[in-house]
Amino acid sequence: MSNPEKAKNFDLMAFIGRNSKEIRWPEIKASAQELKKKYSKVGAIGYCYGGWACLKLAAEPSLIDAVSTAHPSLLDKAEIDAVKQPVQILAPENDFAYTEELKKYTLDTLPKTGVSWEYIYFPGLQHGFAARGDPNDPKQKEGLERAKRAGVNFLAGYLH
């Protein structure tokens, strides 16, 4: 969040309560279904909160053709297990949400799915780097730019 005043007053737990998976998944799924009616190929990029949704989409081939996520949050092992479409994960070194345990699980599990996947590690960067990294900090700026290029290139490979 770029506005320090809003960031200070942001109540994460209230946000998650108002936007739980149970509340938002039906809306996300319906949106993907509508897009698939209009377009032959559909992709999704989800940063942070959108990460779990991308992996749930990737479990349903009729909904999506490929997904990319950076520093996913609220992700669980079952969502990783269920992947059936190409997935890209952009993982910072330091992430309270996409934990070391989940990173290891991802790297152990995705090769067994038979699905095309890509995992890109961003050393020295934190959760949120791809969405709200500091463009005035050279390391964070590089991460922002690299993540953007990686996501676009990954999806372009599956959507054209």
Show which residues each predicted segment covers:
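N-terminal cap/leader regions of alpha/beta-hydrolase-fold enzymes
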Residues: M1-H160
